[in-house]
From Swiss-Prot:
It is found in: Membrane. It comes from Human cytomegalovirus (strain AD169) (HHV-5). Keywords: Glycoprotein, Membrane, Transmembrane, Transmembrane helix. This is Uncharacterized protein UL6. It is a single-pass membrane protein. GO terms for cellular component: membrane. The keyword Cytoplasm does not apply. Glycans are attached at N79, N102, N111, N147, N162, N174, N196, N211, N228, N234. Its main location: membrane.
């Protein structure tokens, strides 16, 4: 009875201390309200409580790793710098580096005040959010937007993590996209003398234009491949991490079930009795 009260008080204390984390709070309450079946010996009861405390620690680690890593809070915007670019060009948004931790987030405010996360850098990892229909890239201090259009305009932000559960807005940018000017041409009928030099210059100019377009296309494709490779690498890392946690929890549960059923103890007793029988046979 004393052990039961101590275990109950311990789980309730941990539940009270961690009541700010919803998933962990629900899991801890499920473990706390679980009752030991009648007729179970005290040694098994202690093992059950040991397993419960171990599961509590695992849930605490999982909750701390995944619950607040990607939270984006909406706060008051600082004074945003205005950046103007022409449609079809590339835009670069330059911001400061994070002061205390090596985590940086880039995103855009939708509907005026709702932050939507586009890119996150932490340590040597990068997480990119897809579905924006915009070719972009990010680094610690710069956010790149390639071949901007009028729909690319808006308010973009940079946030730095300050080693706690709060995100600090480092800078924001009001990106204005100006339509490309339409060149007016006047047709003047003048006699033209076609020579070999004129034909050669026209041919060289067309080749340069073609090569420039091909280079920009190849550069964009290369950037797309790099982004897709980074994203697939991040997905693989996340799958490996959470898969490892799942395998570890399953193995731990299997070991605790075997211990509760008494299979290791019975196997040890049988082996000891077999050894004792052999020793008695040798003595006789």
């Amino acid at each position: 009875m004393h052990a039961k009260m101590n275990g109950w008080a311990g789980v309730r204390l941990v539940t009270h201390c961690l009541n700010t984390r919803s998933r962990t709070y629900v899991a801890l309450n499920m473990l706390a309200f679980a009752r030991t079946p009648r007729g179970v010996p005290s040694c098994l009861f202690n093992k059950v409580w040991v397993s419960r405390y171990a599961l509590v620690l695992i849930l605490m680690v999982c909750a701390s790793e995944s619950s607040t890593s990607w939270a984006v809070t909406s706060n008051r915007l600082p004074n945003c710098s205005t950046i103007t670019t022409t449609a079809g060009q590339d835009a670069e948004l330059h911001g400061p580096a994070p002061l205390s931790c090596n985590v940086t987030q880039w995103g855009r405010y939708e509907n005026g005040s709702t932050p939507v996360l586009w890119c996150t850098l932490w340590g040597s990892r990068t997480r990119v959010s897809l579905g924006h229909r915009v070719a972009f890239g990010c680094s610690w201090k710069t956010f790149f937007i390639y071949n901007v259009s009028e729909s690319s305009g808006g308010t973009y932000y940079q946030k730095g993590y300050n080693c706690t559960d709060k995100h600090i807005t480092l800078s924001c940018f009001n990106l204005t996209v100006v339509p490309r000017a339409v060149q007016s041409t006047t047709t003047v009928m003048t006699p033209t003398v076609v020579t070999n030099s004129t034909f050669s210059v026209s041919l060289v100019a067309s080749r340069l234009t073609t090569n420039s377009s091909a280079f920009r296309h190849a550069s964009y494709q290369r950037q797309q491949r790099v982004g897709n490779g980074t994203l697939s690498k991040n997905i693989t890392n996340l799958a490996f991490t959470y898969g490892s946690w799942g395998v570890a929890m399953l193995l731990f549960a299997a070991v605790m079930v075997l211990v509760d059923l008494g299979l290791p103890q019975s196997a040890w007793r049988r082996w000891r009795s077999h050894v004792d029988d052999e020793e008695r046979g040798l003595l006789m």
